[in-house]
Structure formats: C-alpha cells, structure tokens
Amino acid sequence: MLMKRIKYIFVLMIGVLLLSGCGKNYKPITYTKFIENFNDSEKFYVTDDTLKYESIFERFIEVNGLNSEFTYMEFKTESEAKKYVKTNYKNNSYYKYKTSGNSIVITSNQNKYVYGVQVDKIFVIGQTPNKKYKSEVNKNMSKLGF
C-alpha cells in the first residue's frame, strides 16, 4: 500500500514537471537588446533597414552571419504582427505553428532550419540554410530569451 502511494506521488510529480513547461510566456525583446546580442560577436553583421520598411514596421533589423541570419520585426500593433505570422506561416505545411502562452512559435526542419517567436508586436526569426547549424540558431535565440 505504501509503495503504491509512493509511486502515485512520484508519477504525479513527473506529470506536474512535464506540464509546467507548456504554455511558456515569453517577454518581448527590445531592438537595442537584439542588436547588443550580435554586436558583441565578430561573426555577425547588423543592418538596420527600418527606413526601407517604415510603412510596415516600427523597426526592421537584420543580422547576417556566416551560417545563420536573424531578423527583428517590430510592428505598429500586435494584431499586425499576428496577422503577418499567420499569413506567412500558419497555413504553410513547411512550418510547424503553435500558440504557446502569450506567443506564437514557428519552426521548420525541412531543408533549412527556422525558429521564430512572435510576442506582442515583436516577431524575431532565426534561420539557417543548412540544418547542421541548427544549434547556432537555437543558442542565439536562447540568448535573446526565446
């Protein structure tokens, strides 16, 4: 009887741990923090293309590296950001699209690796044309808080 109760408590604890990772709430990142993350490294070249896209975005920053690239898009409103992500990623079978807490997360593992997160009016996407550099994308997205 005691062993059954211990097993039950153990299984319950494992279940709680597994479920606690679901629905993660990300925090929006500022463009200055985004730029600082990549300015520290000589591997990346940062370009602020906001003026080129000012009719669509509040901020548009691209970071290009040897093996990966990252884009920071700050929309004028959260609804514009969600619409952009849904239009470009939700109905495309190439991407996995899921809502997680207060954000939308997209990934793809076909041919190239893509990892993007939309929080509030911010959408950040990292990608690499070669899946063997997936860890570089994940490492930098993790540094950004995703």
Stretch-by-stretch model annotation:
Residues 2-10:
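Bacterial N-terminal signal peptides that target proteins for export
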Residues 96-146:
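A short, solvent-exposed beta-edge/loop patch
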Residues 12-15:
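Alpha-helical hydrophobic membrane-insertion segments
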Residues 23-25:
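Bacterial signal peptide processing site
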Residues 10, 57-61, 113:
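Alpha-helical context
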Residues 32-108:
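Short, solvent-exposed recognition patches
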Residues 18-21:
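C-terminal motif of bacterial Sec signal peptides marking the signal peptidase cleavage site
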